C-alpha cells in the first residue's frame, strides 16, 4: 500500500474513518462518496459520531452514479475510560441490527443532554444562543462539540476551531461538560452484536502519556477489541511505527483513516494512509473469501 501511485495502476486505498453532515462533517454523504473516488479511495468507511444515518444515502448515491467505491458501514462511538473520552469505531456493522439501533438512540439522548449543558454554561459566560446555533449548524444531524466550536468561531469568540477548544471546550474551561458516555466494553459488545469489528480510534490523539496509552490499548485488547488505528494523515513516522508496535504486542489488527470532516490543506481522504510492515489490515477480516465446506 505504500507503493507509488500511477494513473493506470495503483494499490487500493483504504480510508476507514470519515464523517458527513449526519454528525460533524461538512459534506453530505453524496458529496463525500464522490470526493472519495476523486481522491482514488477504493474502500471508504463512513463513521459518523453515534449515528449511521448517512449510510443509506451514501449507498444509494454509489449505486445511482455507478461509483467504483466499496462502502463499509461504520460508526464512531463515544465512550469514557478513566475520565477520558475515548472513541471506538465500529466497522462493517449491520446498521439495521436492533441492538445497534437501540444503543445509538441512547447515545443520542446522552449527546443531546450534554449539548444543552454546554449551552447553559456558555450562556452563564455571556455567550447566548449557543444551543440554537449548534442545532442550526447540525442541520438535523447529531449535535457535537464541533458544532458549538463552529458557532463560537462564527460569533467571533475565537479565530479557529482549535482555539475554541483551548479557550472554551477543553477540560476545565467554561463550556466543558464531563462526558457521560458508555464504557469501552459496552461499545465493543454492541459492535460485535451487530456483526462488526471494534477499532480503537486515533490512539495517538488522546491526552495520555506513553504509559497511559499502553494501559488504554491493553484494556481495549483485554475486552476483545479487534483493531486499532495505526495510520492517519497528520502523523509523524515515529508515531505510526510506535502504534504498529502496540498493535502487534496486543495481537490487534491495524486500521487506518483520515478522520475526514471537511476539505482542508492538511487532512484529505486517503492521504498518506499506508500501514507499516508487521501489521495486518482489519479489512482482511471481511475481505477474505469464505472457504466452502
Curated annotation (Swiss-Prot):
SUPFAM superfamilies noted in UniProt: PHP domain-like
Keyword terms of this UniProt record: Exonuclease, Hydrolase, Manganese, Metal-binding, Nuclease, Nucleotide-binding, rRNA processing
Binding site for Mn(2+) 3: 76, 87, 202
Domain of life, source organism: Bacteria
EC number: 3.1.13.-, 3.1.3.97
Binding site for Mn(2+) 2: 24, 49, 261
GO BP annotation list: rRNA processing
EC class of the enzyme, as a word: hydrolase
Enzymatic reactions: a ribonucleoside 3',5'-bisphosphate + H2O = a ribonucleoside 5'-phosphate + phosphate
UniProt cofactor(s): Mn(2+)
An MF annotation (GO) of this entry: nucleotide binding
Matching PANTHER family: EXONUCLEASE, POLYMERASE_HISTIDINOL PHOSPHATASE N-TERMINAL DOMAIN-CONTAINING PROTEIN
Functional note: Exoribonuclease that catalyzes the last steps of 5S, 16S and 23S rRNA 5'-end maturation. Removes 3 nucleotides (nt) from the 5' end of 5S, 16S and 23S rRNA precursors to generate the mature 5' ends. 5S and 23S rRNA maturation occurs more efficiently and accurately on ribosomal particles as compared to free RNA. Efficiently catalyzes the hydrolysis of the 3'-phosphate from 3',5'-bis-phosphonucleotides as well as the successive hydrolysis of 5'-phosphomononucleotides from the 5'-end of short pieces of RNA and DNA, with no specificity toward the identity of the nucleotide base.
Family: Belongs to the PHP family. TrpH/YciV subfamily.
Protein name: 5'-3' exoribonuclease Rnm
Organism expressing this protein natively: Salmonella typhimurium (strain LT2 / SGSC1412 / ATCC 700720)
